[in-house]
Amino acid sequence: GKRGKGGTERSRIALLHALANIEQWAIDLAWDIVARGPRLSVRHMQSSDTDRPDMPLPRAYFADFCQMALDEAKHFTLLQQRLVDMGSFFGALPVHHGLWDSAVETREDLCARLSIIHLVHEARGLDVNPLTIEKFRAAGDARSVDSLTTIHLDEITHVSTGHRWLTYLCAVHPEQPSPVDVFRANVRRHFVGQLKGPFNAPDRH
């Protein structure tokens, strides 16, 4: 394809395909944290020497992650449609398993799952999405820009959800650890690689 500021069409298809792959994993991960939440929250509460009755997760936890699953399915559908519009399809290219590897790594610790999936991987998306959107804008691909903008705005709420429930779990734990300390400890323990900038501070906040 012809190369311009937005790269070749082939490179843009590859980028959309990679993003669709991430969204497909994200659908499963939203339902996974719904299903694992009750058992892992009990384990979280028992990780202290202090006796405290089990606190069931509030309904809002389940509502938040069910909404996230619906959002991720919408995102996958938007990206899949753009691939078809551009003469490709999801499954046409190889995919990577980084997100799923992190899910497996954090499968027994709810705070680790929230930290790594939602506050590292999804927050990283907030950093790179604007650059991706500009690449498609430079290529004159307004439909992809619209889809990617919709996805970006939803992902801001997903990072907020991860932050909200990590903060909640720290607050209800008998020892009330600092969410920042818990996050940093989980990144050191469970995340392979370095957190590299640039960071999109406005959307992260």
Language model regions located:
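Non-heme di-metal
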Residues: 1-205
